[in-house]
Structure formats: structure tokens, C-alpha cells
A protein has these predicted regions:
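Phosphate-handling active-site elements
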Residues: 35-39, 70-75, 127-128
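Hydrophobic side chains in well-ordered alpha-helices
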Residues: 37, 61, 95, 117, ...
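Glycine-rich anion-binding loops of enzyme active sites
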Residues: 1-66, 187
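Active-site glycine-rich loop that binds ribose-phosphate moieties when present
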Residues: 27-39, 77-98
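Glycine-/charge-enriched secondary-structure boundary and capping motifs
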Residues: 1-13, 18-22, 29, 100-101, ...
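Short clusters of hydrophobic/aromatic residues that line enzyme substrate/ligand-binding pockets
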Residues: 38, 62, 86, 194-196, ...
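Short, compositionally biased
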Residues: 61-77
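Internal active-site segments that recognize and position negatively charged phosphoryl groups
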Residues: 49-53, 88-113
């Protein structure tokens, strides 16, 4: 926390970081001009759904910390990387700032991709079709069974990557600015619900 606060020149003045008899919760409110607002509620049909970085690393790091991850598949370097992703996530501030004026809707992935993307869909009154094969995995996660890595990427939290929707043209511009950092994983649809393509090539709801 101290490292990140120093890097981004902010003051850490509290939070749920210690134990004690008294807990004080503070909300910070600010102002932003209308043209600079990035909301969850503005996704449009045919928008591409994108994420930054790699997904599932923090959840894998947590499973390792809890002794729930198969250790024979990964090296010590892999474990160090996964724990760093869990304990010291990288804020995507630079990309987030560039989304203003290019993305229609955005959210950080703290509760897992499916849960957080669903916030965008509910707020926007839209649906989504996801390409599961396009989920971005780190080299460490690629060493795990595909089904396990996919589950971690879809439902694991604490990645703090960004999920956003934008037109194909604006996604292309963002990819030029941030090569290898932005991955298209699906498309916004007018029909509500979240679907993926199964092994038979059929679209199936995640709830099924």
C-alpha cells in the first residue's frame, strides 16, 4: 500500500488495514465534467467487450496461499508471480484515462469478470456473447488445466484489471496505444443475458 501510494502521489489516511475496537468508514466524493464520465450504464449493442492484462492470476495466487492449488504444475517463479499479482495488483490508471471519450462503459474487475461484466449489462439493459477461448492468461496460468484456468479467469476476483465496451474502431485505436495489453473477449448484444459458445458451437447461457 505504501509503495502504490508513493508511486501515484496519494496519501493513505485509513481504511480497513488494522484491527481495533473502533471502525470508521469514510466515503470520498468528487466532481467530474460530464464529458469525462465513464459509467457502467452506457454500453451499446455491437460494442466489443475488452479486458486489460491477464485474468485469474490473483485467484490462483490466493488458492496457492490457502494450499488449494496443485503445486506440481508450476515453478517457484510462477508462484512468486501469482502471489505478487494477488498482493500488489497494478492499477491500470494510464489505460483508464485513455478510455475517456473512447469507451462507452467500464468497470474494474474486483469481484470476477462474470460478476463485474454483469454489473455493466444490468445497468445498460444489454446482454453479451463471450468468446471463452479469447480470455487472456498469463504464462503461469497457461500451465494449469484449461478448465481450471478458465474458471479462475471468469470468477476469480482481485485482478483489478479493467473491463470495458467500445466500438471496433475505438478498440483498434486503444490497441495501437497499448499493444498486447487489451484483449477482445466478446460483444454486447441487444438481447439480455450472458452467453458463451460451447464445444458443439451452440450459444449457451452461463446459468445453464
Amino acid at each position: 500500500l505504501a509503495y502504490i501510494a508513493k508511486k501515484y502521489q496519494i496519501q493513505l489516511v485509513g481504511g480497513d488495514t488494522t484491527r481495533g475496537p473502533l471502525t470508521i468508514t469514510i466515503q470520498v466524493h468528487g466532481h467530474v465534467t460530464k464529458q469525462n464520465i465513464l459509467q457502467r450504464s452506457a454500453a451499446e449493442s455491437t460494442d466489443l467487450i475488452c479486458v486489460t492484462g491477464c485474468l485469474g492470476d490473483a485467484a490462483a495466487g490466493l488458492q496457492f496461499r490457502l494450499g488449494q492449488l496443485e503445486t506440481g504444475l508450476l515453478t517457484d517463479t510462477d508462484f512468486e508471480y501469482l502471489l505478487q499479482r494477488l498482493e500488489m495488483p497494478t492499477p491500470r490508471n494510464q489505460i483508464g484515462q485513455q478510455l475517456v471519450g473512447k469507451a462507452h462503459a467500464a468497470i474494474d474487475i474486483s469481484d470476477g469478470l462474470l460478476a463485474d461484466l454483469n454489473h455493466i449489462l444490468n445497468a445498460s439493459g444489454k446482454g453479451a456473447k463471450l468468446d471463452i477461448s479469447a480470455l487472456p492468461f498469463s504464462d503461469a496460468l497457461k500451465k494449469l488445466p484449461t478448465e481450471m484456468a478458465t474458471q479462475l479467469a471468469l470468477t476469480g476476483g482481485d485482478d483489478y484489471e479493467l473491463c470495458f465496451t467500445a466500438t471496433a474502431g475505438n478498440v483498434a485505436k486503444l490497441k495501437q496505444q497499448f499493444p498486447e495489453m487489451i484483449q477482445v473477449i466478446g460483444e454486447i448484444t441487444e438481447d439480455v443475458g450472458m452467453f458463451y459458445q460451447n464445444a458443439q458451437g451452440e450459444w449457451q447461457a452461463f446459468s445453464e
